[in-house]
């Protein structure tokens, strides 16, 4: 009797062992995102951002970003453009280390700058994204007024599990993470 049970128990046992060894692999492939710390942002974002042919000072206290479990960031900071040729053209510097679509604008890993103009009605911003090195425009997205009362922030990049929004003042643009 025990000889007949052995093959019947070994095969299912082996199958369960194989499945249990694959579970950690599947869990490891799921990427989680969290808010980046001030120290992480300070080590990632430059004190002077390379924008076209200039190095424009950044205001680190406005830095915001997210980081995934693989150490890839999406982070930005306000540019201090007074006195530079970028004045009135760009307001923020953005580093993207994983593909992302911001309000319909697809951004590959790289460095970008963006600026905005307010809609005539005042309820939206037209946000234009440019490559930081060349100034070439990548696309334009619309940031909408955040409904209700919210904290006004120069820049806040929310983790996707919370809101999947990039907040600029009282306005926000939704984003979607892409695959690398």
Spans of model-derived segments:
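N-terminal secretory signal peptides that target proteins for export/translocation
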Residues: 1-7
